[in-house]
Amino acid sequence: MDPPAGAARRLLCPALLLLLLLLPPPLLPPPPPPANARLAAAADPPGGPLGHGAERILAVPVRTDAQGRLVSHVVSAATSRAGVRARRAAPVRTPSFPGGNEEEPGSHLFYNVTVFGRDLHLRLRPNARLVAPGATMEWQGEKGTTRVEPLLGSCLYVGDVAGLAEASSVALSNCDGLAGLIRMEEEEFFIEPLEKGLAAQEAEQGRVHVVYRRPPTSPPLGGPQALDTGASLDSLDSLSRALGVLEEHANSSRRRARRHAADDDYNIEVLLGVDDSVVQFHGKEHVQKYLLTLMNIVNEIYHDESLGAHINVVLVRIILLSYGKSMSLIEIGNPSQSLENVCRWAYLQQKPDTGHDEYHDHAIFLTRQDFGPSGMQGYAPVTGMCHPVRSCTLNHEDGFSSAFVVAHETGHVLGMEHDGQGNRCGDEVRLGSIMAPLVQAAFHRFHWSRCSQQELSRYLHSYDCLLDDPFAHDWPALPQLPGLHYSMNEQCRFDFGLGYMMCTAFRTFDPCKQLWCSHPDNPYFCKTKKGPPLDGTMCAPGKHCFKGHCIWLTPDILKRDGSWGAWSPFGSCSRTCGTGVKFRTRQCDNPHPANGGRTCSGLAYDFQLCSRQDCPDSLADFREEQCRQWDLYFEHGDAQHHWLPHEHRDAKERCHLYCESRETGEVVSMKRMVHDGTRCSYKDAFSLCVRGDCRKVGCDGVIGSSKQEDKCGVCGGDNSHCKVVKGTFTRSPKKHGYIKMFEIPAGARHLLIQEVDATSHHLAVKNLETGKFILNEENDVDASSKTFIAMGVEWEYRDEDGRETLQTMGPLHGTITVLVIPVGDTRVSLTYKYMIHEDSLNVDDNNVLEEDSVVYEWALKKWSPCSKPCGGGSQFTKYGCRRRLDHKMVHRGFCAALSKPKAIRRACNPQECSQPVWVTGEWEPCSQTCGRTGMQVRSVRCIQPLHDNTTRSVHAKHCNDARPESRRACSRELCPGRWRAGPWSQCSVTCGNGTQERPVLCRTADDSFGICQEERPETARTCRLGPCPRNISDPSKKSYVVQWLSRPDPDSPIRKISSKGHCQGDKSIFCRMEVLSRYCSIPGYNKLCCKSCNLYNNLTNVEGRIEPPPGKHNDIDVFMPTLPVPTVAMEVRPSPSTPLEVPLNASSTNATEDHPETNAVDEPYKIHGLEDEVQPPNLIPRRPSPYEKTRNQRIQELIDEMRKKEMLGKF
């Protein structure tokens, strides 16, 4: 960072100067501020910062042709044509590139942009399969107002970067400038206009864009994002070191090539719901472009090769909600209820006609409200795809990185579980798998795990709603061989860049084996990607490449799509009576598909209904006959059984044969489908099973018809011919045996038989025509509640505390007799009710009721919840279906034909609303017991007290006070560690006595800073080498060597100075300023100004009792004496004219060679004459006085002040 002008002439304050010394300069200046707040949000990384470490630059992209030549500065779709016309540029031929042959060549776009010193040539093609034909964007207002406009996706593009076709991916929109993702193998870029709404100004000098880059070693977007209730993982900083090799291997083995469209494509038609918080953040004028760009990225994620299936995410409808509706759907802090509200809302938006353009398979809801705990990004049911209510997800929108959240939650709905939770794919979590419990995927590093692929393949075939294609099949015919349109020179340019062409430096035996390319600047340096040229590439006059060989092309080897042949005649009927089916088939042989051609689309069979006449045995049950056939052939549990028909509860299993044992009641699958023409359900007399699938048939006998019978069996009737019959019979047991009560005629429907009072008797029913009992024979009474099939209909029998009930929807195919098996002499009373067509009534039947509503009726069930908890709301009556006989609530389907009463409205909760307040939960245990990363979290919610002593969560904006903190640091003490000593350094001298040093660090098991309780090992020691050689160069001169060894001394202790290494001198001229010496305790400043700080500490700490600051015991310690004393051999030469003097407080001594005197550190020393002469008696070094004076006035003042404090301390 350059200093501001005049900085040398002004005095900087110490704090500012310290920042100038310690802070590194920024990589680039920030972009200019936007014009308004809306632009400010757009200028930041999409949806907020991309995370710490994201770099940004300004760039001006331009539109080019396929060769990278400038076409226009206009990049927006709205003005691109005008820009080209303004320049009157000649038409430029823009051929399509490999992998993008879905559209006309003229629809491709090419852009050049320079990002961080790299010139990128973007090759784009329209993403024509993101927005379905007829898709709309709907604005739902506060008072039920709705505004609908067409949803256009004409400015959405996907593609790659030239030269990196297999290792790059681009998803951009050019609605208003370029916005979206540019992904390459090792890094990713986001690009968006610096300011929006300036497309009209592009033609003059281009348009400034912001480009963000995330390096491959940085954490993923926004850090790990919690999904569902996933547990936190290790930090990415530690993972980057441990997974470096694995990521390199994974990146090299996993290709991100864009998939070609396959015949087994699945299309998820999406309703995208957006609440008001998202609209307000992005702005009404920009939200549509943002949503299309976001979903374009989601679509690219589902096109990744690792998924193992080709799934298209197709937008059919976008709904933007008002503020009031948004607040009613999202319940703060309650993700389960919020998801239920969103799914219910999406279900209500569904179009009733499945053929409608806006009919959706799946709903995605985006919000910026905090619907769950802190960090929760999404919520979704598992395996809910195609379900009318459960196929929905709730997602927290937070910029383009939310694309991974949407993909993750939609993966749950498709049946995928979290990686590492219940499966064995935990090893793929750290590599950036989409279904990780925490979002760790990034645009340069993401994939679907092997478990996700397996779980998807397990369920995908059952999602029938994904099989239809919302797009019209009017695409242009694809070339039979792609190489027919590209020469080898063009393919070399696609592979290696501009200028490259086919290598001619050597002749290969067959040029179709591998494509070799070279540049004219170095024609003898040929390169290849070890792949052959495209099939159809011309390789010799009249010859073309095909499957790696240069051959003559003949019609029999070209790609050929299949086509259906003629239908065969209809075969025989599957049944002789009771309605069967007959089939006809066709073959895909006109012609057969060949050489990779498409197979025929559609079903290979067709069927018709046949043999519709009733069977002679009116009581025959076709499903029962199929089960009965196994009585003699199928043993279960080493025993034979009498098999009865059973209807499976799952509608998808009803065309598979399940039978129930009469002896044990056990239900067994016969592992086969029912015969064609079997009724799907006993509740539907017309729909039939055809090849394992239930085909809807109306009562009019038309396949696919929705026409139904009324309550008494009239097809399309209005119940006008229906009559209700009821009665009550009371009998007293007079003898043993059955007591006959009454008969119910054939044709009766909606039959209900019930005891008036609970008794010990047993109800029995007999088929009058066959004489066989269908319920409770005298010697075989089963009083347990059950559902069974008899006489071709399903019966429900219940015994509730001795009160028996029997009912069936009918119709009865024969008359039944109702009897009672008496137990005791208690009177028994039975009531019965049923509906029957008036033509089937007996003339003398006096129990006919004229009204149709005698069996069931609508009754008040409860009041709906109040629309407001306070401040005056409203609630409405909710009705349920009630049986008149006993006033029990039953399924509302029984009252479907009755007119429902109009709801009644009333006021509720008129009391005034209380002021919401912040409510905090208990702090959770600290995430760490020691170290520097411990954190505690707690829940913080805005709660509004209600009048009934309950509370509810509301939006944070309703609380006036400052939001309490939800995270805080904890347990930040250093962890226990152990001393680790390094190797000893070389001796400080080459001869004589010196010192050695070594680093001693306190480290924990994971090699982080720690605190050690044990005594620290020594960091310095003496070393003794051989005696130094004498000076024989000038015998007339005499030299003396004073050997001085440092050793701890209580009077002159050694001081510790913490640093990361030996001081190499000051690194800034500002270090000499005494006013900055107060910052020497800061490690960063001490390292920067180590020399000045050492001098300052030596002068101000005479006794050397400075202790290292708390928590800093992990640095390398360098031992230095408190006052400058010699640590190496010091040579003293006597002057010829003056007596020899030693300036170290020399005095007389009695030391001799035999009795050496000890010096200031109790180390024996000797004074050696270099020529064995007698040493001067006054050459004895003494301990220097700590009170010596200095010429520096300021330093002397500090020394005097310290001396005074020391003297006062002694007194």
Swiss-Prot record:
Zn(2+) binds at H408, H412, H418. The active site is at E409. Residues 561-616, 854-912, 914-971, 975-1029 form the TSP type-1 domain. Cleaves the propeptides of type I and II collagen prior to fibril assembly. Does not act on type III collagen. Cleaves lysyl oxidase LOX at a site downstream of its propeptide cleavage site to produce a short LOX form with reduced collagen-binding activity. Its cofactor is Zn(2+). One of its GO terms (biological process) is lung development. GO terms for molecular function: metalloendopeptidase activity; metallopeptidase activity; zinc ion binding. InterPro entries: ADAMTS/ADAMTS-like, ADAMTS_ADAMTS-like, ADAMTS_CR_2, ADAMTS_CR_3, ADAMTS_spacer1, MetalloPept_cat_dom_sf, Pept_M12B_ADAM-TS2, Peptidase_M12B. Residues 1-29 form the signal peptide. The keyword Hydrolase applies. Residues 723-851 are annotated as: Spacer. Its EC number is 3.4.24.14. This is A disintegrin and metalloproteinase with thrombospondin motifs 2. Residues 266-470 form the Peptidase M12B domain. Residues 1170-1191 are annotated as: Disordered. Residues 1059-1097 form the PLAC domain. May belong to a multimeric complex. Binds specifically to collagen type XIV. Residues 30-253 form a propeptide.
